[in-house]
């Protein structure tokens, strides 16, 4: 079985600019910078069906120095998901120094940290963004074993209208092949 492909993926790239394009109907994550440095994503219009799971808008993963601005994202899953690998990822590279500004998020899950965060997520600024009818605004999701730390997150001048849960923190996020894993009864961190 082959997983659905990403629409756009940059792997181990430096000095990437993706701007002023419309991306629609992605089979999986729409834009996936992986282990990249100095990435600028601006002026994107991303539209995926509201009932399409795992069709995230932009998912920087293990990246440094990323600027995402002036984008409109309307998807069936995470609008932006900041990631840094799972517990099985051999290269646990942190995702750090991200600026997300002047974006509009429609429907979907807003701006998400995780659930893949074994390398840590550091120094993220989300500012001057509008969330309209998203089911979440800012969401942190992880689970035991993922490891990693989250630090230096700044949220400034955000507008959330008709957002079901503006802030969600889930430390027992279920994931796996069928979307569920056995519940953990032991509350020890590792």
Report each predicted region and the residues it spans.
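Extracellular/periplasmic carbohydrate-active domains that bind, remodel
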Residues: 1-190
């Amino acid at each position: 079985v082959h997983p659905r492909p990403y629409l756009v993926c940059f792997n181990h790239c430096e000095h990437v600019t993706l701007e002023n394009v419309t991306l629609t109907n992605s089979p999986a994550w729409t834009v996936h910078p992986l282990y990249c440095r100095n990435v600028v994503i601006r002026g994107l219009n991303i539209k995926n069906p509201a009932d399409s799971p795992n069709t995230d808008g932009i998912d920087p993963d293990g990246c440094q120095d990323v600027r995402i601005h002036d984008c409109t994202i309307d998807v069936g899953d995470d609008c932006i998901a900041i990631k840094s690998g799972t517990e099985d990822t051999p290269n646990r590279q942190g995702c750090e120094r991200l600026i997300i500004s002047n974006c509009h998020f429609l429907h979907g899950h807003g701006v998400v940290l995780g659930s893949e965060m074994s390398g840590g997520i550091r120094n993220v600024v989300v500012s001057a963004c509008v969330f309209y009818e998203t089911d979440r605004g800012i969401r942190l999701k992880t689970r035991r074993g993922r490891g990693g730390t989250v630090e230096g997150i700044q949220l400034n001048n955000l507008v959330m209208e008709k957002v079901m849960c503006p802030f969600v923190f889930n430390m027992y996020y279920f994931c796996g092949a069928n979307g569920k894993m056995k519940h953990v009864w032991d509350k020890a961190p590792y």
